[in-house]
Amino acid sequence: MRVMRIKRTDSSFTIDGFRINPKYRYGSYTRNDNDGPRTYNVKDRKVPSVTTILSATQSPEKKRTLENWRNRIGHEEAARITNQAATRGTEMHYVLEHYMNGQGYLNLGDNGVQPRMMAHTIVDNLEKLSEVYGTEVSLAYEDQWAGSTDLVCVYDGKPTIADFKQSNKPKREEWIEDYYYQIAAYSLAHKKQYGEITQGIILICTKDLLFQKFMMSEQLLAKYEEKWFARVEDYYKRSK
């Protein structure tokens, strides 16, 4: 990662060539993780998270694939791999969030080195990032769903929802459809609450520091927004 260079101008400031611009006054919603599936407190209601809806509407095929993997390597080993990946992802997100906000973050523990290098790899591939509107942005679509997206920004001149992902191995596009659904859900909520989004981007770094970028054009985003509405409808039908 480059040495952070900050230049302040009125209410915004520039870091390494991109501008932090508080264009929107983003609110925040508290998250509930301890009483069943994840929800967010939106006004006076508990609203299901995007990941809760995705999990509840998984296809039987995807559920079988996950269960077969657990059975093949053993449930204890599967839990260890899952927990390691979650810890690595959390640390990587901390580094990226602080960098995008013009702050420093450094975990000197053994579990901080690899995620920091992964975050640096992602940052070094953000040459088309020109503005940051917000990080860890809380979004809700009325009382239908809520969640937090990693980054709302201007990328390659277009208002963009971006998500950072860690991975144990390189991804094929057919493996990341749930990521497309997440971007679509956040895009719809942002349009409803704040302003236009015309593309999505998923930025992945593996534990071996392989970088991948998956772009969602305006057309692909619109396609998955429609598909997301269908998933939400299915979720609420199942919940009755």
Whereabouts are the PLM-identified features?
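DEDD superfamily 3′-5′ metal-dependent exonuclease/proofreading module
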Residues: 2-7, 20, 156, 160, ...
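Metal-dependent nuclease catalytic cores that hydrolyze phosphodiester bonds in DNA/RNA
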Residues: 1-146
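Mg2+/Mn2+-dependent nuclease catalytic core
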Residues: 134-239
